Swiss-Prot record:
Catalytic activity: UDP-N-acetyl-alpha-D-muramoyl-L-alanine + D-glutamate + ATP = UDP-N-acetyl-alpha-D-muramoyl-L-alanyl-D-glutamate + ADP + phosphate + H(+)
Organism phylogeny: Bacteria, Pseudomonadati, Pseudomonadota, Alphaproteobacteria, Rickettsiales
Stated role: Cell wall formation. Catalyzes the addition of glutamate to the nucleotide precursor UDP-N-acetylmuramoyl-L-alanine (UMA).
EC numbers, comma separated: 6.3.2.9
HAMAP family in the record: MurD (MF_00639)
Name of the protein described by the UniProt record: UDP-N-acetylmuramoylalanine--D-glutamate ligase
Any single biological process term in GO: cell wall organization
GO molecular function: ATP binding; tetrahydrofolylpolyglutamate synthase activity; UDP-N-acetylmuramoylalanine-D-glutamate ligase activity
């Protein structure tokens, strides 16, 4: 029962519902008793299930056939409807609803769409799996843009999205799903709820999933489409129009899919090209997503802590050379070999941390990429910076772990903050020296 669970409980209590809640973690339970006034904390084994109308699951509680939580089994045995905060939100908000899913880029796309719509005069709010519990979002907005995970999509029933977006589908969460086909099917549930679908035809899994969809706007970052949105070589192409996307605050290469999808959604809602392009240029991006945090001499530091899969790391590497790459953590299925087959020549050296360090070392050795065991982010930053600055060439120290953070950190934000703190400690003397010289 994290932030989403707390916001769900508080919202339902305020609406007048009788709410029962539970968390297996005793420390969390103790804290939440103080935060959630009006809620009864009762173990599910003591529920009178015939009196319960719905079981609302927090994100991450396993509920798929191959990996089912004990409480889900109890609810199913009692014939109780199992739902999520997102479904409750969607059926209670009379506003435009835009849902965004995919393996990589969801949060940035959600925030970019919201950024564009607000600048177009469409009062909008973002939420969902991005870290803002949807039931705590302010009411009365003209549009809500929601990040939807595969878990949330599986629990949704009878939802009506004005626009649904699929950015990409690459291997992820295969510790939860029995195979890739099940993961794709979970993502594909957004098709059932979308009046208009915006989909990446350049991604093979997404293209196959959407091949029989009627009302759809396609986008591609690999070829120019006769119909749909294309982002190529720093330009957006749509219905015979061409717009330059230079001078962005975010990296255009790694954010090409996010830009294309956001453009398509905004156009579908009637936003002008002028407003869209001006908004994209001013969008500041999100923390922990290919975020430039400092530049010292010839070295740029980039915090990409959110990159927990090989496919997301590839987006950071595609626009950079001479990379001193900090990688590792709690490994996911797929490893890093797909990255190395394409981008090994961009990596000057890898600095390995966390549980996956030994496994990654084997892959790097096969690809003939130099690497060193650092075990934690602080040491990795220190060593990588020393080697990068000694190289005398323009270089990037990149935290892009290709792993989850749960071996050493509470979440990817905490890991990214640790990287930024280590960088700040290094950068401070150089800034002082630079100021003194001037």
């Amino acid at each position: 029962m994290g932030e989403t669970g707390i916001s769900t409980v508080c919202s339902l209590v305020q609406s007048g519902a009788r709410v029962l809640a539970w968390d297996d973690d005793k420390c969390v339970l103790r804290k939440n008793r103080e935060l959630c006034a009006g809620c009864e904390f009762v173990h599910p084994y003591e529920y009178r299930w015939d009196e319960i109308s719905e079981l609302v699951l927090s994100p991450g509680v396993p509920h798929s056939r191959c990996n089912e939580s004990w409480v889900v089994k109890l609810a199913k045995r009692a014939g109780c409807h199992i739902t999520s905060d997102v479904e409750i939100f969607c059926r209670s908000r009379p506003a435009r609803l835009i849902g965004v899913t995919g393996t990589n880029g969801k949060s940035t796309t959600v925030e970019l769409i919201g950024w564009i719509l607000n600048r177009a005069g469409i009062d909008s709010e973002t939420g969902g799996n991005i870290g803002k519990g949807v039931l705590s979002l302010p009411q009365g907005k003209a549009a809500y843009i929601l990040e939807l995970s595969s878990y949330q999509l599986e629990l949704m029933r009878g939802v009506n999205l004005d626009v649904g977006v699929i950015l990409n589908i690459t291997p992820n969460h295969l510790d939860v799903y029995s195979n890739m086909a099940d993961y794709i099917a979970a993502k594909g549930r957004i098709l059932e709820f979308s009046n208009l679908l915006v989909a990446n035809c350049g991604d093979s899994n997404t293209a196959h999933l959407c091949e029989n969809v009627g009302n759809m706007v396609e986008f591609s970052c690999g070829k120019k489409l006769a119909r749909g949105v294309s982002v190529l070589d720093g330009r957006i192409y749509f219905q015979g129009r061409v717009a330059e996307i230079g001078g962005l605050k975010i990296d255009s290469a790694s954010n090409a899919e996010n830009i294309a999808a956001s453009y398509a959604v905004a156009k579908s809602l009637g936003v002008s090209d002028e407003v869209i392009m001006a908004s994209i240029r001013e969008f500041p991006g999100l923390r922990h997503r290919n975020q430039v945090v400092a530049e010292v001499a010839n070295v740029t530091f980039v915090n990409d802590s959110k990159a927990t899969t090989a496919a997301s790391v590839a987006k950071a590497l595609v626009s950079r050379e001479n990379v001193y790459w900090i990688a590792g953590g709690k490994s996911k299925d797929g490893g890093i070999e797909p990255i190395l087959s394409l981008y090994a020549n961009r990596i000057r050296k890898a600095f390995l941390v966390g549980e996956a360090a030994d496994m990654f070392a084997v892959s790097l050795q096969r690809a003939r990429v130099e690497h060193v065991m650092c075990y934690d982010v602080y040491n990795a930053v220190q060593i990588a910076f020393a080697e990068a600055i000694a190289s005398g060439t323009k270089a990037t120290v990149l935290l892009s772990p290709a792993c989850s953070s749960l071996d050493q950190w509470k979440n990817f934000e905490e890991r990214g903050d640790a990287f930024c703190a280590a960088v700040a400690e290094l950068v401070a003397p150089h800034k002082l020296c630079s100021t003194t010289t001037q």
